[in-house]
Amino acid sequence: MPLLWLRGFLLASCWIIVRSSPTPGSEGHSAAPDCPSCALAALPKDVPNSQPEMVEAVKKHILNMLHLKKRPDVTQPVPKAALLNAIRKLHVGKVGENGYVEIEDDIGRRAEMNELMEQTSEIITFAESGTARKTLHFEISKEGSDLSVVERAEVWLFLKVPKANRTRTKVTIRLFQQQKHPQGSLDTGEEAEEVGLKGERSELLLSEKVVDARKSTWHVFPVSSSIQRLLDQGKSSLDVRIACEQCQESGASLVLLGKKKKKEEEGEGKKKGGGEGGAGADEEKEQSHRPFLMLQARQSEDHPHRRRRRGLECDGKVNICCKKQFFVSFKDIGWNDWIIAPSGYHANYCEGECPSHIAGTSGSSLSFHSTVINHYRMRGHSPFANLKSCCVPTKLRPMSMLYYDDGQNIIKKDIQNMIVEECGCS
């Protein structure tokens, strides 16, 4: 999340702290002036007026995020039956058997998808010529050594069709995986089919496709299951034999040019009497159509490098930086007449101490900044010598709201960075 937004959130948090904290003269609860947000740890939980003032601060925050100066005046609410019917028709929420509305959290799902996409790597591996004719060898990059969950894997092949010969309109292309395997121990899976055994060597049908043989173009063959099996077995190479029995009849040919094959064909081109300039241009064009494997993969949920340090939950047993749960029910504060959904707001906040040894340990955008500042602060370098590390939000999630405006219109608004999910030391 942008650092600028976090600073703005910090200011809002400080306002809540000031409103909820006792006066500076109160004994035993003085706020630290050089770290205002740290004063949340000293918030007097037993003072009767502290809870209402926190709620008032939350109210103002919600109105501000909805760009409202005051709560809408709902003098003539829409009949319940009409409201529920409209919600069903517009697919903006689900209506439970008890009549309560449950808003569809599309923005939350999108945030989860975006987070997943950020953790996904895409690797393109160009083919090398295999040991046998019409075979290709793919060596998956070391970049993917920590990736164990395949999202998508495809082999791309270029079919070249001469303009003069277009007798056949369709051809079938098959991809076979070649591997050494003890007999009787093959795991064929859904995508592969065992088609032949020669001693300890086996061939599995990876993919098959009927393609148009009237024009030169790329064709894509899915091999996700096969690559997943390779990764599960701790392997990183794939040997593929390409078969196209009807290609010769149609005059079409698959470009299977790899580094080894290029060297082998250099001599053949000269023997055929082709000019070096023309042969070089043809080879360069062929290389632009070199087969490749496209892999999208991510680390598994239980991978040790993927486990990010999670923020602590305040449970009364810890005094270091943690997330404090604070739920405000819209029914309890009299706002359920204009807010249709959700039923309340998780106004979580951060509190606790930030000792020097944990500053900058959170997996947030603040971590690098915090670690550098802490490095200089511990060594007494100006201007960081007198700074204290503060407990601040490091991860926030969006919130969707369904509510009435002053004109009795139903509004659905997605509000970014509304709910504190994790806290860390800045």
From Swiss-Prot:
Residues with glycosylation annotation: N165
UniProt subunit comment: Dimeric, linked by one or more disulfide bonds. Inhibin A is a dimer of alpha/INHA and beta-A/INHBA. Activin A is a homodimer of beta-A/INHBA. Activin AB is a dimer of beta-A/INHBA and beta-B/INHBB. Interacts with FST and FSTL3; these interactions prevent activin A interaction to its type II receptor. Activin A interacts with ACVR2A. Activin A interacts with BMPR2. Inhibin A interacts with ACVR1; this interaction creates a non-signaling complex (NSC) that inhibits ACVR1-mediated BMP signaling. Inhibin A interacts with ACVR2A.
Alphabetized UniProt keyword annotations: Cleavage on pair of basic residues, Disulfide bond, Glycoprotein, Growth factor, Hormone, Secreted, Signal
Family: Belongs to the TGF-beta family.
A GO BP entry: response to aldosterone
Ranges of Basic and acidic residues composition bias in the record: 263-274
Record propeptide residues: 21-310
Protein name: Inhibin beta A chain
Gene of this entry: INHBA
Extent of the signal sequence: 1-20
Residue stretches in coiled coil: none
Presence of keyword Signal: yes
Region named Disordered: 259-288
Record lineage: Eukaryota, Metazoa, Chordata, Craniata, Vertebrata
Single GO molecular function: protein-containing complex binding
Subcellular location: Secreted
InterPro entries in the cross-refs: Cystine-knot_cytokine, Inhibin_betaA, TGF-b_C, TGF-b_propeptide, TGF-beta-rel, TGFb_CS
GO cellular component terms attached to this protein's record: activin A complex; enzyme activator complex; extracellular region; extracellular space; inhibin A complex; perinuclear region of cytoplasm
